[in-house]
Amino acid sequence: MLVTLMKAKLHRATVTQADLDYEGSIAIDRDLLDASGILPHEQVDVLNITTGARFTTYAIEAPRGSKVIGVNGAAARLVQKGDKVIVVTYGMLPAEEARNYAPTVVLLDDGNEIKKAA
């Protein structure tokens, strides 16, 4: 049997922009994608700590070093610049492998600098 587990998360990211007119997605600094293992075009859940809103979208790459967390398209109505969010991805593993699996967790500060990655 396969079970769905958290693959990776960016914890307490700060939204830097919200663009209603862009055609969807969440733009994430390439450094943060690399640190977390989140892939461009990978499905992600975004959990807004500030408002409690939750939505699903996909990740796109923002320039390396930009510290951008930019919510685009219709989902831009669910965030405001400065909101704290959690960006989560999931994967499926056989139950036996899942018992020993550890996800990647990247904790961010208010400026989207990495405080801790494990």
From Swiss-Prot:
Chief localisation class: cytoplasm
Xref: InterPro entries: Asp_de-COase-like_dom_sf, Asp_decarbox
One biological process term in Gene Ontology: alanine biosynthetic process
HAMAP family from the UniProt entry: PanD (MF_00446)
Function: Catalyzes the pyruvoyl-dependent decarboxylation of aspartate to produce beta-alanine.
Family affiliation: Belongs to the PanD family.
Protein name: Aspartate 1-decarboxylase
Native source organism of the sequence: Phenylobacterium zucineum (strain HLK1)
Gene: panD
